[in-house]
C-alpha cells in the first residue's frame, strides 16, 4: 500500500476512539462520537464482541434502580409483552418460552457450582463439534488478544505494558526532568533509536526491531505482511489495537489535531504497536497458546441458556438437534443484551413520564417579564437549575438559560495564566483572540512578584528531581511542609484563608481590561478583538439566544460559572463544559462590556433591539461548589440598576443557604448542614483530602429548549440543562439550529461521558481518585502502568462501592416548538437526525397547544 493509503487507513480507524485533551483542560467527550452512524445497540454488541466491554447498565445497577422506583415495572412488562407477542417458535411450547423469559429477564448470573468440571468439558466438546466453521465467524481483532503464554498471560497485555512505557515517555508535558531523546524527530523515529537498547526484549527481538523500516507507514505495511492481515481486514485490525489502550491512543489523536509537528502521531503509534506485536508473536523462546474467542462466547451462551431453562448438561445432549437449535434461537432472540436494552428503555421512559407529570403539574402561564427588576442569564449547566429556582422564589427576578460561552468564539489570554485557552465548545475552533491587560506599572510589579514565586517552585522541583540535592531537600523543607500539611488537613478553611490573604497582599492581580476593539498583531494567528460590526452582531446573537430582545430589566447579570476545589486533578471537569473545561466568567464579562457600549447599543437599535438607557449589564461567576455569585464586572450603575442590585444582594444569602442545603443533602458523609450549609460547603471545597467536592453534572438527564415558564414551577432536581428559546421569534429556525449544533451537542457529550463512566468504569472511567497517579502532566493512570484513564473518576458517579449516584440514561432533548419546526430541523440537520434515529439521544417536543410528543 502507498504511504498515503496507510495514513488514510489510520485516519478511518480512529473513529473508534476520541481525542483526549490534557487533564488540565479536561472537557467532556462522547466516547462513541465516531460510531454514531450505527445504532446504540449495534455499537454495544460490537464493543462487547471485540473488546468485552458492556455499555448497557449491569444487573446490579438495574436492580438498584428498580428498588429506588426509578424504573416502573409496568413500563418494562408492557414493552416485553409487546415483543413477546411477535415472537413465534414452533419447536418450543409457550411454557418453555415463558420459563426462559421469566428467568432471563432478571439478568441473574450463573450460580456457582451449577456446572461442574465435567459439565464444562462436555459442553466445550459439544460447542467445538457444532461450530466447526468458527474461524469464518471470528471478529477481526489483534492476534495477540487471543494468544496466551504458558503462564496464562495474554500476549496483548505484554504488548500494552510496552506501549504504556513508551507512550508516557513521549507525551510527557515537561513533568520529567529528562525528556525522551530524539522526541523532536517524532514518536516512531525516537522509539526506533531507543528500543534496540530495551532489556525487556530478547537479543533477537531487539535485532529485528533495529532493522525495521525507517518510515512508520512502511513499518505498518511490513507488519501487516508478517502478521498475514488481509487487506480487507486492515482497518478493523488497527481499530482493535486502538481500542486496546483508548486513553493513550486518544492523547495521540488529540496531539495529532493540535500540534502540526505531530500530524501523523497516531500513525507512529500504530506502527510501534504492530511492530512490537509482530516480534512478540514470532518469539520462538516462549510457548504460545491460541484460544478461539468466538468458541468461548458460544460456550458462555449455551451455559447461560441452560441455566435459564433449568436444564442440566445430560438433558441438553439428549435433545434432538432441531430442539437444541430452537433453544439457541430463543436464547439469541431474548439474549442478555435484549433484556438490558429493554431495561434501559423502560428506565428512560419512566423518567420521561415523571418529567411530563412534573412539568404539567402546575398550569403554564406567561408571566409579565417587564415586572422583573433583575434578569440573570446562567449557563445551561444542570447545577444552575436549583440556584435559579431558589433565586426566582425570593423576589422579582427572572432567570435565563444560555450556553456559558455566550456565543463568543474566542480564545482567551488571561493575565495570570501562562497559556491562552479556547473559551468555547471543544468541537468549535476559536475565531478571535481576546487578551486581558492592565496598567503597565502594576503589571511590572505583579510579574516580578510572580517570577519570584515561580522561581522558588522551579528550584524546589529541580532539587527534588536531581540525585544529590534531593537528599538534602527533606532537611530543608521538612518543617515548612509539615506545618502546611497539618494546617491543610486539620484546618482546611483557615489554611485556605491564609493563602488567600497572602495572595491578596503579595500577589494581588491588577484589575484587568479586555481588548474588545480590534488590534493589529503580526504574530497572532487569530485576529485580536472585534470590529464594531462584529461586536454588534455577536451581542445581537447572544441576546437572541437568551430570548432577551425586549422587556429589559434595569439590571442584567450575565453569569458564567466555575468551581472551587483543592488538590483536585479533575478540577477542569467541574468547570464550564461550554468553555472547554474553563470558567466562563471571562466570556460573561466580555459580553457585558460590549452590551454597555453606546456605539454597540446604537447598532443593536438599528437591528431592532432597543436597550433602555437605564439598563446596565454586569458580569458574575456562579461558584458551583459553594453556590455563591461572585461579581467580576460592575460598571457605574444607574439609579434604577443600583436599586435592583441592592435588592439582589439582599436576598442572595438566603438563596445561597437554600441552594447549599439542597445540594449538600445529596453528598455522602456530610455533617448536618441545617444550621450553616454555607460554612459546610466552603469547608468541603477547601479540604484537600476531599475526593468529592461536588457532584458536578451527575444525574443529568434532559435538555429543555423553550420558555422558562414551562419549567418555572417545576423542581427538576438539578438534572436539567435549561436553554431559553421562543419559537415565535425564530421563523427560519436558525436560532434552534444553533442551539442544537452547539449547546445541545455539548450536553450530549457530557451526558454520554457520565453514562460511559458509570456503566463501564474500568474502561471508560478513571477509577478511584485515591489510587490515581498524575502521569506525564497530561492525565492519570491507576498505579504506574495502566491505560491513560480518560473518563470521570469513581467518586464523580458512584455513591458508594455498590450504588451508582448517576443514573445512566441517554439525554432527552425537549423542544418547545410546533411540529413543523421539529420536522424542518430533522430534515436539514442530518447529524442530529442520525443521533435521534440511532438512539444516541431521545427527542420530544411541546407544541403550540402545549401537547407533548415523542419523536
UniProtKB/Swiss-Prot annotation:
A Pfam family per the record: DabA
Protein name: Probable inorganic carbon transporter subunit DabA
Protein's UniProt keywords contain Membrane: yes
Signal peptide range in chain numbering: none
Chain positions recorded as Zn(2+) binding sites: 379, 381, 561, 576
Cofactor(s) in the UniProt record: Zn(2+)
Keywords: Cell membrane, Membrane, Metal-binding, Transport, Zinc
Family matches, as PANTHER family: INORGANIC CARBON TRANSPORTER SUBUNIT DABA-RELATED, UPF0753 PROTEIN AQ_863
Main function: Part of an energy-coupled inorganic carbon pump.
Assembly description: Forms a complex with DabB.
Protein's UniProt keywords contain Membrane: yes
Coiled coil: none
Topology term for the membrane: Peripheral membrane protein
GO cellular component terms, semicolon-separated: plasma membrane
Top-rank lineage group of the source organism: Bacteria
GO molecular-function terms, A-Z: zinc ion binding
Subcellular location: Cell membrane
Amino acid at each position: 500500500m502507498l504511504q498515503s493509503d496507510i495514513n488514510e487507513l489510520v485516519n478511518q480507524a480512529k473513529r473508534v476512539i476520541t481525542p483526549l485533551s490534557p487533564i488540565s483542560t479536561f472537557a467532556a467527550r462522547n466516547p462513541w462520537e465516531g460510531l454514531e452512524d450505527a445504532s446504540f445497540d449495534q455499537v454495544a454488541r460490537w464493543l462487547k464482541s471485540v473488546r468485552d466491554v458492556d455499555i448497557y447498565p449491569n444487573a446490579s445497577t438495574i436492580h438498584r434502580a428498580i428498588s429506588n422506583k426509578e424504573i416502573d415495572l409496568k413500563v418494562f412488562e408492557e414493552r416485553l409483552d409487546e415483543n413477546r407477542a411477535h415472537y413465534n417458535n414452533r419447536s418450543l411450547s409457550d411454557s418453555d418460552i415463558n420459563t426462559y423469559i421469566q428467568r432471563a429477564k432478571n439478568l441473574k448470573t450463573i450460580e456457582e457450582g451449577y456446572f461442574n468440571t465435567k459439565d464444562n468439558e462436555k459442553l466445550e466438546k459439544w460447542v467445538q463439534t457444532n461450530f466447526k466453521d468458527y474461524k469464518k465467524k471470528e471478529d477481526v481483532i489483534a492476534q495477540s488478544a487471543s494468544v496466551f503464554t504458558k503462564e496464562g498471560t495474554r500476549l496483548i497485555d505484554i504488548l500494552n505494558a510496552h506501549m504504556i512505557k513508551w507512550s508516557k515517555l513521549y507525551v510527557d508535558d515537561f513533568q520529567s526532568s529528562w525528556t525522551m531523546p530524539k522526541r523532536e524527530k517524532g514518536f516512531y523515529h525516537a522509539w526506533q533509536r531507543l528500543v534496540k537498547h530495551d532489556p525487556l526484549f530478547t537479543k533477537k527481538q531487539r535485532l529485528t526491531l533495529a532493522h525495521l523500516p525507517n518510515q512508520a507507514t512502511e513499518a505498518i505495511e511490513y507488519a501487516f505482511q508478517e502478521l498475514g492481515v488481509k487487506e480487507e481486514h486492515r482497518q478493523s485490525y488497527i481499530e482493535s489495537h486502538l481500542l486496546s489502550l483508548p486513553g493513550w491512543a486518544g492523547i495521540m489523536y488529540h496531539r495529532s489535531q493540535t500540534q502540526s509537528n505531530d500530524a501523523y502521531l497516531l500513525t507512529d503509534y500504530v506502527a510501534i504497536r504492530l511492530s512490537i506485536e509482530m516480534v512478540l508473536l514470532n518469539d520462538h523462546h516462549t510457548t504460545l497458546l491460541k484460544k478461539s474467542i468466538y468458541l468461548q462466547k458460544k460456550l458462555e451462551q449455551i451455559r447461560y441458556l441452560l441455566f435459564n431453562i433449568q436444564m442440566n448438561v445430560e438433558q441438553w445432549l439428549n435433545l434432538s438437534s432441531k430442539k437444541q437449535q430452537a433453544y439457541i434461537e430463543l436464547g439469541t432472540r431474548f439474549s442478555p443484551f435484549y433484556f438490558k436494552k429493554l431495561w434501559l428503555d423502560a428506565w428512560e421512559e419512566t423518567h420521561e413520564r415523571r418529567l411530563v407529570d412534573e412539568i404539567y403539574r402546575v398550569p403554564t402561564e406567561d408571566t409579565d417579564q417587564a415586572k422583573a427588576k433583575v434578569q440573570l442569564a446562567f449557563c445551561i449547566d444542570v447545577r444552575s437549575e436549583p440556584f435559579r429556582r431558589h433565586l426566582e422564589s425570593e423576589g422579582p427576578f427572572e432567570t435565563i438559560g444560555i450556553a456559558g460561552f455566550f456565543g463568543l468564539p474566542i480564545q482567551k489570554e488571561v493575565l495570570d495564566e501562562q497559556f491562552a485557552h479556547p473559551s468555547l465548545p471543544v468541537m468549535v475552533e476559536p475565531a478571535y483572540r481576546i487578551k486581558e491587560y492592565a496598567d503597565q506599572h502594576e503589571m511590572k510589579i505583579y510579574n516580578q512578584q510572580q517570577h519570584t514565586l515561580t522561581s522558588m517552585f522551579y528550584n524546589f522541583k529541580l532539587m527534588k528531581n536531581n540525585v544529590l540535592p534531593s537528599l538534602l531537600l527533606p532537611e530543608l523543607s521538612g518543617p515548612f511542609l509539615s506545618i502546611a500539611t497539618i494546617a491543610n488537613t486539620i484546618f482546611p478553611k483557615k489554611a485556605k484563608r491564609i493563602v488567600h490573604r497572602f495572595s491578596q497582599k503579595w500577589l494581588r492581580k491588577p484589575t484587568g481590561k479586555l481588548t474588545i476593539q480590534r488590534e493589529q498583531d503580526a504574530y497572532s494567528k487569530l485576529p485580536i478583538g472585534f470590529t464594531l460590526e462584529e461586536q454588534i452582531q455577536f451581542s445581537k446573537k447572544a441576546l437572541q439566544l437568551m430570548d432577551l430582545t425586549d422587556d429589559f430589566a434595569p439590571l442584567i447579570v450575565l453569569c458564567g460559572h466555575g468551581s472551587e476545589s483543592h488538590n483536585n486533578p479533575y478540577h477542569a471537569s467541574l468547570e464550564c463544559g461550554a468553555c472547554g473545561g474553563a470558567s466562563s466568567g471571562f466570556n460573561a464579562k466580555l459580553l457585558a462590556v460590549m452590551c454597555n457600549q453606546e456605539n454597540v447599543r446604537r447598532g443593536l437599535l438599528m437591528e431592532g433591539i432597543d436597550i433602555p438607557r437605564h439598563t446596565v449589564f454586569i458580569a458574575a461567576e456562579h461558584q458551583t461548589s459553594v453556590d455563591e455569585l461572585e461579581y467580576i464586572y460592575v460598571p457605574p450603575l444607574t439609579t434604577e440598576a443600583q436599586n435592583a442590585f441592592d435588592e439582589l444582594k439582599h436576598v442572595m444569602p438566603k438563596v445561597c443557604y437554600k441552594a447549599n442545603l439542597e445540594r449538600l443533602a445529596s453528598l455522602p458523609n456530610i455533617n448536618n448542614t441545617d444550621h450553616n450549609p454555607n460554612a459546610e460547603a466552603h469547608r468541603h471545597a477547601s479540604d484537600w483530602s476531599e475526593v468529592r467536592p461536588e457532584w458536578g453534572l451527575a444525574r443529568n438527564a434532559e435538555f429543555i429548549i423553550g420558555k422558562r415558564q414551562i419549567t418555572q414551577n417545576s423542581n427538576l432536581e438539578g438534572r436539567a440543562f435549561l436553554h431559553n428559546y421562543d419559537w415565535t421569534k425564530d421563523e427560519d429556525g436558525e436560532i434552534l439550529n444553533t442551539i442544537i449544533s452547539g449547546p445541545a451537542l455539548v450536553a450530549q457529550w457530557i451526558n454520554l461521558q457520565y453514562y460511559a463512566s458509570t456503566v463501564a468504569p474500568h474502561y471508560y472511567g478513571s477509577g478511584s481518585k485515591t489510587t490515581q497517579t498524575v502521569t506525564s502532566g497530561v492525565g492519570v493512570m491507576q498505579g504506574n502502568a495502566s491505560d491513560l484513564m480518560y473518563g470521570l473518576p469513581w467518586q464523580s458517579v458512584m455513591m458508594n462501592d455498590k450504588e451508582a449516584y448517576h443514573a445512566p440514561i441517554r439525554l432527552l432533548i425537549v423542544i418547545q416548538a410546533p411540529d413543523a419546526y421539529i420536522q424542518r430541523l430533522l430534515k436539514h440537520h442530518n447529524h442530529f437526525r442520525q443521533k435521534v434515529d440511532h438512539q444516541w439521544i431521545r427527542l420530544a417536543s411541546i407544541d403550540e397547544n402545549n401537547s407533548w410528543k415523542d419523536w
